[in-house]
Each structure stands twice: as structure tokens, then as C-alpha cells.
Amino acid sequence: MRFIALVFLVGALAIIAVECNSEGDALNAFKMNMLDPNNALQSWDPTLVNPCTWLHVTCNIQNSVTRVDLGGANLSGILTPQLGVLYNLQYLQVENNSISGAIPRELRNLTNLLSLGLENNKLSGTIPSSLGNLKSLRWMRLNSNRLSGEIPISVLKLVLWGNLQLMNVSDNKLAGTVPLANKTGFAITTIVQDMKA
């Protein structure tokens, strides 16, 4: 019986270690695609067992990444698709940088995400319809970028789930309109979009 318990414990620890390593690998891929003149990512050492000791990273008691806070860190580069493996991430805050390129579709995997802070960067392309998968999301800040096209219906439908409280898409190159009224009855939702002439 002790042998079975020991095998189970070793197996559970191995699963946790693999998850932490994949999260560290994902964050390291992000780091490798960033210019970091202020060394905000200097503590991000991929040789460590997990990223929970890195600055700007917060983990839960299972040593899984729940928060990445890099607002105003003077970073430039692209958001990497590997961020989509941070399955327990609740806060992705990379606002007020010079991050460019497209918003990765792989962020759809972050189903525990509460806050997506991508504002005041240089992101371009369209808002991925896959962000409509983020049904736990409460705050989505995409304002002050170079995003174009229409807001996908799947993203607008996040209002229907009653969790999304703020979606700021102002100061972009978006087309189309969004409904002004909240028809859910569950949440006070603010959608901020540039006024069209």
C-alpha cells in the first residue's frame, strides 16, 4: 500500500513539474521575443524549476502561473503564441509598452483569464474572434493600439455571459458599431469605442 501511495505521489509531482516547466518555457519564449532595455525580465531564468520566483510573475499554491504584470516595463517585441499554455493565468497585464504585431489566437486557451490588459501598445491586425472563448473575462483593455476591422460577434457575446464589465477598444482603427445597451441584466458592462462620424 505504501508503494502505491509513493508511486501516486511521484506521479503527481511529475505532472506539476511538467506543467511548471511548460509555463516557464512559454514565458521564456515571450522573453526571447522582447527587447528589454530596462532589464525587467532579467530574473526570468529558464534553468529554474518553475517561474514562480521570477519578478512580475505570480503563482498559486500549486506553483502555476496566475499573473503576469509587465505594465510600463518599456518592452518591445511581439506577443508569442506560447502564452496560450498558461492555462491558470488570471491576469495578463502588458499595457503601456511598445508591443507590436497581432494578438495571438492561442490566448483563447486562457479560460481562467479575468483581466486582459494590452492597452497603449502598437498591436495591429484584427481582434481575434477566438477571444470570445474567454468567458471568465471581466476586463478587456485593447485601447490605444493599431487594431483594425470590426469587433468580432464572439467577443461582443462575452457581455451575454454576465462577467465582462469593461471592454475598451477606443483609439484604434476599428469599423462598425457596438450595441449601446446591456441586455443581460447580469452585469453593468461598459464598452468604450471611438465615436464614428
Curated annotation (Swiss-Prot):
Residues 1-20 form the signal peptide. The lineage of its organism: Eukaryota, Viridiplantae, Streptophyta, Embryophyta, Tracheophyta. One of its GO terms (biological process) is defense response to fungus. Its main location: cytoplasm. Expressed in phloem tissues of leaves, stems and green fruits during pathogen infection. The keyword Lyase does not apply. Induction: Strongly up-regulated by pathogen infection. Up-regulated by high salt and wounding. Not induced by ethephon, ethylene, abscisic acid, salicylic acid or methyl jasmonate. Keywords: Cytoplasm, Leucine-rich repeat, Repeat, Signal. This is Leucine-rich repeat protein 1. The keyword Repeat applies. GO terms for cellular component: cytoplasm.
